[in-house]
């Protein structure tokens, strides 16, 4: 199990860089927020995930160490229940492109399935 050697939050609080094995994994606050491991986002089982929308302006307010295994991240939108294990942060960092593409496609699919009704 890898433990990060460094965790850095940018001054604007929109970019968290986590270093594992001399490799930096920069992740935006939006990306981390929409992939929060909390039950509020992930649900309590497969298929219960809640698509997080309009999180592009969210910033990271606080990073809280959770023993030697994780950090809790508190966000500017009030979300405070995500505890990011080192394993989960490594997954988010190493699969950033793939996971962001998946999220973007789900948002596009949701937008294309909207029914717009003209109000008369």
Residue spans of the language-model regions?
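Motif-centric detector for short Cys/His coordination patterns
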Residues: 1-120
């Amino acid at each position: 199990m890898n433990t990060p050697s460094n965790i850095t939050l940018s001054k604007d609080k929109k970019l968290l860089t986590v270093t594992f094995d001399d490799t930096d994994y920069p992740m935006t606050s939006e990306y981390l927020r929409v992939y929060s491991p909390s039950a509020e986002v992930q649900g309590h089982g497969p298929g219960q995930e809640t698509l997080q929308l309009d999180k592009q302006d969210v910033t990271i307010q606080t990073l809280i160490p959770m023993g030697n295994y994780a950090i809790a991240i508190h966000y500017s939108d009030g979300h405070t229940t995500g505890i990011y294990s080192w394993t989960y942060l490594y997954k988010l960092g190493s699969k950033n492109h793939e996971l962001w593409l998946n999220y973007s496609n789900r948002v596009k699919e949701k937008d294309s399935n909207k029914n717009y009704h003209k109000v008369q």
